Amino acid sequence: MFSIQQPLLVFSDLDGTLLDSHSYDWQPAAPWLSRLREANVPVILCSSKTSAEMLYLQKTLGLQGVPLIAENGAVIQLAEQWQDIDGFPRIISGISHGEISQVLNTLREKEHFKFTTFDDVDDATIAEWTGLSRSQAALTQLHEASVTLIWRDSDERMAQFTARLNELGLQFMQGARFWHVLDASAGKDQAANWIIATYQQLSGKRPTTLGLGDGPNDAPLLEVMDYAVIVKGLNREGVHLHDEDPARVWRTQREGPEGWREGLDHFFSAR
């Protein structure tokens, strides 16, 4: 199997996985985060959140300096020591937030789709929606390559909206609480593969990878991991992978950071 000592990368979703979906608590995972940090194992956060939000969380969690995947893979924040890589400190995949916003405004105006984006409201409203402080809510609006929205139309109209976005080279992705529009070329899996390849190029050896997630939008990330933890989540659809070999995939009984801890216990403590 694998051990905490060998070259290893841990990729983790945030809301509903490392963070509690409601309280944003992460303390049940704290002992494992400390052990991984002491073993120099990078814990690479992957989320629909903005890089500004995630850099704040990195500091809170004691994970500064390592790369992270923001906006569902449309943004890669590079590791501090990767300053020689083109694009430092961030790599943007596909078209910009501003360009996507223009597309959405046109679709809403001409085809009358009903939705509310984070750009339509102020930080106080987002704080009410999310339970975040206003200062943290302000960070959620600093998108660089995606748009976050609340869908307010029918399922039939959603199918039409998704089709129109696909025609325009965009994708519509469901997150833990909100929907996200980003370039069709972007994804957590592509971003993770790029980071893995970069670590391999720098060290001369491909690291073993472990991924943790709780929602359907985490499936592409977990598919490209060597080992995966599917944290019990609130989403009705759940997470379904092509390869669910029990030697590779563990489904937790607990939710959020307690499930995160359970997954690490399964793959490391028992061996």
Swiss-Prot record:
GO MF assignments: magnesium ion binding; mannosyl-3-phosphoglycerate phosphatase activity
Cofactor field: Mg(2+)
Reaction catalysis annotation: 2-O-(alpha-D-mannosyl)-3-phosphoglycerate + H2O = (2R)-2-O-(alpha-D-mannosyl)-glycerate + phosphate
Active-site annotation: D13 (nucleophile)
Keywords carried by this UniProt record: Cytoplasm, Hydrolase, Magnesium, Metal-binding
Keyword flag Metal-binding: yes
Pfam families cross-referenced by the UniProt entry: Hydrolase_3
A GO biological-process term: mannosylglycerate biosynthetic process
Binding site for Mg(2+): D13, D15, D214
Localization terms from the record: Cytoplasm
One GO CC term on file: cytosol
UniProt EC number: 3.1.3.70
Family to which this protein belongs: Belongs to the HAD-like hydrolase superfamily. MPGP family.
Protein name: Mannosyl-3-phosphoglycerate phosphatase
Gene name of the record: yedP
